[in-house]
Amino acid sequence: MTNIRKQHPLAKMINHSFIDLPAPSNISSWWNFGSLLGLCLMIQIITGLFLAMHYSSDTSTAFSSVTHICRDVNYGWIIRYLHANGASMFFICLFTHIGRGLYYGSFTFLETWNIGIILLFTVMATAFMGYVLPWGQMSFWGATVITNLLSAIPYMGTGLVEWIWGGFSVDKATLTRFFAFHFILPFIIAALAMIHLLFLHETGSNNPSGISSDSDKIPFHPYYTIKDLLGAILLLLSLFSLVLFSPDLLGDPDNYIPANPLNTPPHIKPEWYFLFAYAILRSIPNKLGGVLALVSSILILALIPYLHTAKQRSMMFRPLSQCLYWMLVADLFTLTWIGGQPVENPFITIGQTASIIYFLIVLILMPLTNLLENKLLKW
């Protein structure tokens, strides 16, 4: 058995990635989220495949086909809610994974970090297009509002929006192409995740201390396979609790109303995992400025490695940076809350303040605090 594992070309690859992989002996539970993201992706692909068997991507039947899945298909309701809430779990793991990378300085692995940013954008695009498919009120108006943002691009904006729509409004052509893209993108995400892992295994994992762990490595199996299994059980427990007890907790009631282009919902808002970016978008009165701020709020991650002025890699021994980090987390929670509120005072002011604080912490305060800590440590 050992010989097959170490000699067969395919088994050898799996062995080097998941069995005999040398891993740092001190990585904490924050390192579980990479494998949990893999699990989430598998859940989404499997449930999505079964949903696609019964879904109809036509404007006249899309809403009815989702209703049919929930009412008439065997266990269709659980497949549908696993898929919808699986997306929420996916983003919880994704944000935690990025947060871990920021806290412990994993962004110094440049290729891995940059592939991760591409993955984030791809997952966000996939989730957005998936939200349009049930063709409820929020699906239709969410698609209209978000795609319309591209019209802010000078000269070519309007043409670009109509090209994406496949007409002069969000209609049958839009729904059909969104379904096609929503189906193919998860497989592209899986391929990107493999490239992400490939680059990670070139350098080896980071660890909480941020210093090289070459002198103290342990095999991935059985130590971290068991640890990842525990994480997977807890994730599945949370997901099934959500699906079986309150499946609509994170959804919008407006999406149970079939799409009607003649009736605008009072508050158009995306799913909760996009609310922080939506709040930043709304906090700027100018359309182009808002779109630039929205893109910058995520693209700013690409600047993090270049803004890292600290001599120490991890924040583990840097209390001032830790304070700023948790302020940033609190700020993102505030933005998420504001994104779901109506556009009126005091929410407008809170949103604008939180948006300024977000960019201020990342672009100015963090690098300055790093330099101050270097000085305090006489480095």
Curated annotation (Swiss-Prot):
It is a multi-pass membrane protein. Heme b b562 binds at residues 83, 182. One of its GO terms (cellular component) is respiratory chain complex III. It is found in: Mitochondrion inner membrane. SUPFAM superfamilies: a domain/subunit of cytochrome bc1 complex (Ubiquinol-cytochrome c reductase), Transmembrane di-heme cytochromes. One of its GO terms (biological process) is mitochondrial electron transport, ubiquinol to cytochrome c. GO terms for molecular function: metal ion binding; ubiquinol-cytochrome-c reductase activity. PANTHER family: CYTOCHROME B. This is Cytochrome b. It comes from Galago moholi. The lineage of its organism: Eukaryota, Metazoa, Chordata, Craniata, Vertebrata.
